[in-house]
Amino acid sequence: MRVPLSWLSEFVTLQVPLADLLERLPAAGIEVAEVECVGADWDREKILVGEITAVRQHPNADRLTLATVAYGGGRTIEVVTGAPNVTVGLAGVKVPLALSGARLVDAYAPEGGTIVLKPSKIRGVRSEGMVCSEKELGLSAEHEGILFLPEDAVPGTPLAELLGDTVLHVELTPNLAHCLSLAGLAREVAAMGCGELVARADALAEGGGDASAAVAVRIEDPDLCARYCAAIVEGVTIGPAPFVLRHRLRLAGIRPINNVVDVTNYVMWETGQPLHAFDLDRLRGEPGGAPAAIVVRRSRPGEAMSTLDGARRELAAGTLLICDGKGPVALAGVMGGLESEVTDATRRVLIEAAQFDRTSIRVTAIGQRLPSEASLRFGRGVPAAGCPGAARRAAELMRRHAGGTVARGLVDVYPRPQEARTVRLPADEVARVLGANIPEAEVRRILVSLGCTVAAAERGALAVGVPATRLDLAIPADLVEEIARITGYHRIPSAPMSGEFDPPCPDAALDAEDRACDALVACGLTEVITYSLTDPAWCLRLGLESDASGFVCLANPMTADRTHLRRHLLPGLLETLQHNLRHVGRVAIFELARVYIPGGEQLPEEPRRLGLLLSGPSSPPWWGEPEPPL
């Protein structure tokens, strides 16, 4: 996850230097893989904010124009450009201006190539500088047009002052799903003592019709969709989002699309709640119901749909879908459908904020090969409590940036509301698990800073009320882990293991395997370890099995070519041979491992087997000797 510090600062006021923050985050289990300083390599005297004052046609080229650019202090320069968005008559637009001597990314060179700008004649006209695209500045891969800056940008200002930022590339383990948002990460930073949370109060101006009269929402399987919220914004005008919003999305690694779609991504980055925007006028209703309908259900046999990427997708049985009154309009939590996408003609938008079952979303994303930021978050767990707030936040931002009005109310279907959870933390549990004595006052402070409530319980224990946003806190060990993280693992003293250890028990079978492996290695073979998962087609082609019924099948395979547990070692050895023959002519390998034989209703048998594979000359070739036999 990419975290621009300027954006994070809207949620937490940092009170420590960046170097200290970078030291504390890994100590709490939040790895920072890279620190990207955007604009640090922009020359502050040669890469500036410019204002286009006039554009005229190039006298010798139909596809080029001459732009007069002012850059403060009465200074102007004329540059040649072929950008399609710099047209004759354009004026008053702020753009990035690079003067002679500036170093830029070469938009037409391989990744990482740069150029130093020099005065040049282009089709007979001298150009002293360049107006820049996003790619030439290193902001993104977009280079079809010039980057237009905010209207209030001051000509002559170093571009680094306007667009410069520090972006943290944060790598999060699955247990830190609550940090997949700026709000969640900000709470962690504040809990560590590195900053203070910023109080945010987002008002929502409602003025349209009643949302419940425009759409009806029905959940067929509450086990797969615990909550579904729908907000409606009417009278929108589709266009580019404001510059600040687009720039932040670029820094976060998200390509801007339009003001409506960009708002859904923006709010997801802020809150961690994935959102989707439907064209409300393209959603069909159910007979006798509201004009539009949302039905959350499993797929039916033979169903298919076209997704936003233009692909026609066959749906596996049980795939969770978002449907209207006629059929599927989205793969729930993964990707929207073409039939309901937001287009330039969209005037009414339905904003979806829901909680979907994490396992179901992972199965769909893997099966359809559609990983996304939304499916990543749903797959790790999204709390139902955040749905209404995220939907309202997105509706308000769309009202501001796309016009229109927000319909009154929120359609909120929540069949089984989540009950408040309390975890009992015994008085000695922290010291028992961590081996460190952390004062109770500090334990209370840490838990409260993470959003928990803490009350005294019997026998010195603490009754910890878990916030609805933390799905991962369920048992005392979870709370102890949080206390250890926020304290800092580096502050917990290490102690060597002590006490008596039982002597190892002799294992005749294991000793025999070790002797066999040693003997094979002494004969020149190499031991390999291959996948326990396989494709039965290998065994069918080799004649080892007549059909696939004799294999243990995985209920949720990660890939299409690793769907069953192996019955034989030979397919894995042949795959290894296939790979190694690209590099060497002689392969001598063996594997000693388990195979899996179905046992009916019982667990499969797991006998250990030895497989050997020899290919090529019987010994390595040697200079001056005849070629060895195969």
Residue spans for each PLM region:
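TRNA-recognition modules of translation machinery and tRNA-sensing kinases, especially anticodon-binding
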Residues: 239-242, 246-265, 276-283, 288-414, ...
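Glycine/proline-enriched, intrinsically flexible loops and inter-domain linkers
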Residues: 5, 23, 28, 37-39, ...
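Terminal amphipathic helices with adjacent charged low-complexity linkers/tails
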Residues: 189-220, 402-430, 436-437, 479
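Extended, well-folded interaction surfaces typified by the phenylalanyl-tRNA synthetase beta subunit core
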Residues: 184, 423-590, 597
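Phosphate-backbone binding interfaces of nucleic-acid-interacting proteins
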Residues: 1-209, 350, 367, 373, ...
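Short, hydrophobic beta-strand segments
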Residues: 2-8, 164-173, 226-234, 373-381, ...
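Internal insertion modules embedded within essential enzymes
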Residues: 104-133, 138-144, 214, 338-393, ...
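Self-splicing inteins and homing endonuclease
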Residues: 208-222, 226, 394, 413-423, ...
